[in-house]
Amino acid sequence: MLQRNRIQTSSSTQTETTPPILRLRRPETRQKEDSKVKWTEDVIDNEHMGKHKSKVCCIFHPHREFGQSSDESSDSSSDSSDDSDYERNNDFDQNHRHSHNFDDINSDNSHSHSHGHNFDDKDDISNSSNNQDKGNTGMSKPSSSSPDNLVCEYGHIHKRNKKVRKPKRSSSPNAYERQPNYRNKSVVPVQK
């Protein structure tokens, strides 16, 4: 924005245009406190270890007081009511576990889910309809993925553990427990 100054003389009017000058000054307020990160209340601490993230983990459920049901939420915000609606509408499973594994270099942000399913026996897969009658979680093989993957009733694809375990070898003594084989170099004559 240009500033215009009008200079009037006795017979004519002249207009001068001067560009505005912008001066940047450092504020003299509390600089140390302003440099700290301040989290708003809507930022979630996913792992409850002071590691705040702006993204909510895909399965985040806020902590509730002991004995408090999802209907008796003390927080009146719409977010908590949305979470309780989500749990009621999606048949929330209390055994549902969720973890992230960032330690493995070869995996791209490995992500795993566990729902209290039993993957140990192949009989569990073939008898999934029988297991559902008994109240157990049913698993079925997906048609489009590998035969080692399973789909639970929640629609999650679970991978079977492909590691082949080596049979355990018998324990042997360590270097400190081994006894050296001494050969008797002195021959004792046998008396006849």
Swiss-Prot record:
The keyword Cell cycle does not apply. Residues 25-49, 86-103 have a biased composition (Basic and acidic residues). Belongs to the YPI1 family. GO terms for cellular component: nucleus. Residues 8-18, 69-79 have a biased composition (Low complexity). Residues 1-53, 65-192 are annotated as: Disordered. Regulator of type 1 phosphatases which maintains protein phosphatase activity under strict control. Pfam families: PPI_Ypi1 (PF07491). Residues 157-169 have a biased composition (Basic residues). It is found in: Nucleus. The keyword Nucleus applies. It comes from the Eukaryota. Keywords: Nucleus. This is Type 1 phosphatases regulator YPI2. GO terms for molecular function: protein phosphatase 1 binding; protein serine/threonine phosphatase inhibitor activity. Residues 134-148 have a biased composition (Polar residues).
